[in-house]
Amino acid sequence: MLTWETPVMLASNTASTKKLAFITTFLIIVLCPVTMVMSQPQADVLPLPASDADCLLRFKDTLVNASFISSWDPSISPCKRNSENWFGVLCVTGNVWGLQLEGMGLTGKLDLEPLAAIKNLRTLSFMNNKFNGSMPSVKNFGALKSLYLSNNRFTGEIPADAFDGMHHLKKLLLANNAFRGSIPSSLAYLPMLLELRLNGNQFHGEIPYFKQKDLKLASFENNDLEGPIPESLSNMDPVSFSGNKNLCGPPLSPCSSDSGSSPDLPSSPTEKNKNQSFFIIAIVLIVIGIILMIISLVVCILHTRRRKSLSAYPSAGQDRTEKYNYDQSTDKDKAADSVTSYTSRRGAVPDQNKLLFLQDDIQRFDLQDLLRASAEVLGSGSFGSSYKTGINSGQMLVVKRYKHMNNVGRDEFHEHMRRLGRLKHPNLLPIVAYYYRREEKLLIAEFMPNRSLASHLHANHSVDQPGLDWPTRLKIIQGVAKGLGYLFNELTTLTIPHGHLKSSNVVLDESFEPLLTDYALRPVMNSEQSHNLMISYKSPEYSLKGHLTKKTDVWCLGVLILELLTGRFPENYLSQGYDANMSLVTWVSNMVKEKKTGDVFDKEMTGKKNCKAEMLNLLKIGLSCCEEDEERRMEMRDAVEKIERLKEGEFDNDFASTTHNVFASRLIDDDDFGFAMNR
């Protein structure tokens, strides 16, 4: 057999050599013209790419008052893995991923060109500064995903083609500047745009036709816009179009007959250039297709020949296959054993063993550590289930499993988690790490020994386990107010910075210091589930008017105050929407009107003799925060200030005078505050 096989193989090799020579000649003939076209001289010498640090330092030189960022030291790298050495620089895997210089009083014109060479740059934020002049050029930032320029002093018209080529841009915030002229038509051609805020400017004319199907939020209020609202935006919140010259059509009132129809889809400013490029692109694609077909043919020939040569050795091939199958099954058995305890409680196992950490001061662990650890079910809330678990280091953690975030994209979710990871406040429970999978998300935080405020307010109490006394409750609500005030200052672009404030989302540490949880999750929640489950959507303004405002979180704070003072669970939280008949606010108001104010307070709440007036003050704040008309409702900053001013056993006459008018309608009178305080 060998004497016959050897000549056959040699002949085959000779034939293969001829075929490959023919294919090579053909490829040279086909590719030479393409190579000649693509190799036209672009520049005599290509400059060496600048480092990220060089780009940042050149950008710093363009700033008028850059003393705020003195930490930008040329001798130190801007990034160290996922942590930042330079203030305001955001890093991912050791590369500059973003720049966040917000609220620093920066002035002058904003020149972004020095940053264009940072290849991994994905987000820029210069909100709440004093930059002036025209809109900075962003045409060289094709990979940018988010641009935040709100609350500055930019002026002038934005060119129609200002955003051409920004095919990855998802979020653009230009609110509260002084831009004028028409809305740039190139915005309508950003394929991945999710959020657009143009409110608080001087744009005029008609709104262009936005054809993006995934556009979730578009804000045009307080401009000089007129004409019909494009049909593609008809499902937006009506508030997004308020304060304009003469806009009409859904979701606003219908247009009159002379208002014209919805504006046509605008022509792209670069459509002519694109058409000219289509012909060249088509030729290149055809050539590439031919090349791929040839390569595929060669691969098939070689693969067939290899199979024929291997068929002479069936026993060896069988041994290899059996060994592979054995190893694979063994690995599956090991994986199944390691996650049995987890799957029995949590369901499906995440398919990538990678946790992303947001805090640097915590010992690292991986997903397998969590899978192997025993866990205690803490509860099943509206968003998902919570588990208490401990890792090898002895640290106790809470793992929250969220099921209603599967509509958010991977990049958008990562960006929002990094934003939450930068929040630092004594009354916020920081997210230690998180895990992303499309079907579900895991958020990991430190376990708090005294659990939630709800467990203390609504659990069965005894002599050994009494209810919370008044000083502790005051301490808790003051901490909650401080945490909310911080969220309002840091998350200015969110309509509802918390969005899901309730007693079960306030946890207590070993000294009963409160920490807020589940904050700022609305941007990554599925729309349908957030409407049905989040506390903000049970507010009067959403049920009666169909919108949320900054004061929606104030309403949630007011209900929490009343829950803390009365010890009663807000039953309206169990129903969908707002039901005044089931509202805790209605019950408290009726008790006050009936001169039964003393019966409102939780009888298990002990305190000093002279704390009655202070408790009444907090009750007044709570009711003021719960005004059904949000225009009459207290501002968050005022509520935080008044709560912080409360001191045990003291009465503030100035505060009482400022709130007299608000509560006169509810017949609250200081003299009526008669009840037996437990001692």
Curated annotation (Swiss-Prot):
Binding site for ATP: L378, G379, S380, G381, S382, F383, G384, S385, S386, K400
Keyword Signal part of the UniProt annotation: yes
Pfam families per the UniProt record, alphabetical: LRR_8, LRRNT_2, PK_Tyr_Ser-Thr, TMEM51
Residues bearing the modification Phosphotyrosine: Y542
Extent of the signal sequence: 1-39
Region feature Disordered, mapped onto this chain: 252-271, 311-344
Organism: Arabidopsis thaliana
Catalytic function, reaction form: L-seryl-[protein] + ATP = O-phospho-L-seryl-[protein] + ADP + H(+); L-threonyl-[protein] + ATP = O-phospho-L-threonyl-[protein] + ADP + H(+)
GO biological process: regulation of pollen tube growth
EC number(s) from the headed UniProt entry: 2.7.11.1
Phosphothreonine: modified positions: T472
Top-level EC class as recorded in UniProt: transferase
Repeat (LRR) residue spans along the chain: 118-141, 142-165, 167-191, 193-217, 234-257
Similarity remark: Belongs to the protein kinase superfamily. Ser/Thr protein kinase family.
Spans through the membrane: 278-298
Subunit structure: Interacts in vitro with ROPGEF1 (via PRONE domain). Interacts weakly with the GRI peptide.
Gene (UniProt): PRK4
Protein name, entry field: Pollen receptor-like kinase 4
